[in-house]
Swiss-Prot record:
It holds the Pfam family HIT. A motif (Histidine triad motif) lies at residues 101-105. It comes from Rickettsia prowazekii (strain Madrid E). This is Uncharacterized HIT-like protein RP317. Residues 7-120 form the HIT domain. InterPro entries: Histidine_triad_CS, Histidine_triad_HIT, HIT-like, HIT-like_sf. GO terms for molecular function: catalytic activity.
Amino acid sequence: MYNKENVFAKIITKNLPAEIIYEDKQILAFKDIAPIAPVHIIVIPKNEYIDYTDFISKASIDEIKHFFSKIADIANEAGLDKVGYRLITNKGEKSGQTIFHFHFHIIGGKKLIGLINNND
């Protein structure tokens, strides 16, 4: 069940601050508060989705298309289109998901090495 008190829900309602870099009726993008690269942007839908599976199963085709096309636009605006970037989403606690509102990380601005961190 979606928790309306999660951090991203509070950012959407402006009850928590964020350095917003893009916003429209469906999407919000903002800088990560603990970046792991020079460019680290979080992109979220404004509707209530817990994770990728929830988003894909409940969102309209138009909303899905808009979300993913805007991720590309945001990455390009950040200057990452020519140098490359990584897109990450996590699903569930064991994947590393800590905020249960569907989101993508756009990470770039430096050479990214490795795919996962195996700290047991």
